[in-house]
């Protein structure tokens, strides 16, 4: 059995590793068009802060481990340029040798990830503009920061990525200015969570403008509908789109958000072709249908399952799905979410109740901070639909308790009965989750 995998970062390498683990004698070829092996892209903003720490420290595995230790034929700078689904062949260009060849397969895994949305306005193709997506982007941004010593940076887009970048730049004494086209930041979060992020932006003295159209970049000045801003460099992070050009050209069917349409086994519309990661749809358990939420853990889970399903083709396993759990850091705040959000519930016409509480994270005399817990739930039954949190100290791991509760379809009544650990260094005697659950019970 021979499997060819297009894309070797997250889902692709996970699929390759699982195939070799379960079927060591099978042939696995990974075609990765860039020069980097699988890496932790979510760590890129934090690497910026350390001039002497190479971006290669974000590699998940060394090339030697992948090739020798796992027995995977992992080819860097080999770009797949066409898929012939009928002949089960991939046309490849070796960018190092500049030669074209064809690679046959029994199974093909499409794991090409996503690509950044780009600005088409004049000036946003110059060298002082970074679309922060890959390790090469990180290398270039570090070079601009440490060699050009910029005093100001314009961040276009106010999502997770640029909020993390703003945090890092601020602490490097580079003045960030954030502009966002939408009316506000973080539209997937409830207003009660967004307001705490906006308070932190104001507290740090960071200039922020929403509802802004970017018009042009002229040298070190960016013109917008809100005026002109000095920008020694610009970081653009305005969302991503699934990288599906090659798949679509082969006649493959696309689905939600233009991602590769997959079934619950992660099979595509083309024969013997699976898809995983940021290029593919993701089954959302609570909605009972596919959605699109490109995150590293999801890509790795899908890749692992694809590898297993290829080996066990007669007894495949369904992808369990996602509950849209995510978290990010912004200065001393952790912002986290799981389950359905208000926008999704309103679009579905669903009735729901909402509560939020503010609570200390642990015993006051042990330090700690404060956190806000927000719950979305069904009146009467108390079924937990979604949860969001923001605050200092232990936030993300508490959010994981709520992610587990949503996975198990727990109610706020059951949540209030959980036997959570207590000691002053870790929690107040009434954990914030229990306080929130008890308030929800009063409304349910």
Predicted regions and their residues:
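Flexible, glycine-rich terminal cap/loop adjacent to redox cofactors
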Residues: 6-10, 14, 18-25, 33-34, ...
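A conserved FAD-binding loop/helix module that cradles the flavin
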Residues: 262, 276-340, 426-443
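Rossmann-like dinucleotide-binding cores of NAD(P)H-dependent redox enzymes
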Residues: 59, 152-154, 160-215, 295-298, ...
């Amino acid at each position: 059995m021979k499997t060819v995998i297009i894309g070797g970062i997250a889902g692709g390498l996970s699929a390759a590793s699982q195939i070799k683990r379960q079927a060591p004698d099978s042939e696995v070829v990974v075609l990765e068009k860039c020069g980097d092996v699988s890496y932790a892209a979510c760590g890129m903003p934090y690497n910026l802060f350390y001039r002497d720490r190479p971006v290669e420290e974000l590699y998940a595995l060394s090339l030697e481990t992948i090739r020798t230790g796992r027995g995977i034929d992992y080819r860097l700078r080999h770009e797949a340029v066409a898929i012939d689904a009928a002949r089960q062949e991939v046309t490849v260009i070796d960018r190092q040798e500049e030669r074209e060849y064809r690679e046959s397969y029994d199974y093909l895994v499409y794991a090409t990830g996503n690509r950044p949305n780009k600005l088409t306005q004049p000036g946003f193709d110059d060298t002082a503009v970074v679309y922060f997506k890959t390790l090469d982007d990180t290398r270039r941004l570090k070079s601009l920061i440490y060699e050009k010593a910029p005093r100001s940076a314009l961040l276009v887009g106010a999502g997770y990525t640029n909020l993390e970048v703003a945090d890092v730049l601020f602490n490097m004494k580079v003045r960030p200015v954030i502009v966002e086209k939408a009316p506000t930041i973080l539209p997937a979060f409830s207003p009660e969570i967004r307001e705490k992020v906006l308070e932190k932006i104001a507290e740090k003295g960071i200039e922020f403008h929403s509802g802004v159209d970017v018009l042009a970049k002229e040298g070190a000045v960016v013109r917008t509908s809100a005026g002109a801003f000095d920008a020694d460099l610009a970081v653009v992070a305005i969302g991503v789109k699934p990288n599906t050009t090659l798949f679509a050209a082969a006649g493959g069917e696309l689905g939600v958000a233009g991602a590769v349409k997959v079934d619950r086994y992660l099979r595509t519309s083309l024969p013997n072709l699976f898809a995983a990661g940021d290029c593919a749809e993701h089954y959302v358990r609570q909605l009972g249908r596919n959605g699109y939420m490109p995150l590293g853990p999801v890509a790795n889970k899908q890749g692992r399952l694809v590898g297993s399903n290829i080996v066990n083709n007669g007894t495949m396993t369904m992808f369990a799905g996602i509950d849209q759990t995510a978290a990010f850091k912004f200065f001393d705040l952790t912002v986290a979410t799981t389950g359905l959000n208000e926008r999704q519930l309103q679009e579905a016409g669903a009735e729901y109740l909402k509560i939020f509480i503010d609570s200390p994270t642990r015993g006051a005399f042990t330090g700690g901070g404060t956190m806000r817990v927000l719950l979305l739930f069904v009146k009467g039954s108390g079924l937990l639909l979604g949860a969001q949190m923001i605050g200092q100290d232990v936030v993300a791991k508490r959010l994981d308790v709520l992610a587990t509760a949503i996975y198990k379809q727990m109610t706020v009544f059951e949540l209030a009965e959980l036997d959570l650990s207590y000691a002053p260094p870790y929690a107040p005697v009434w954990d914030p989750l229990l306080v929130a659950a008890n308030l929800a019970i009063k409304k349910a």
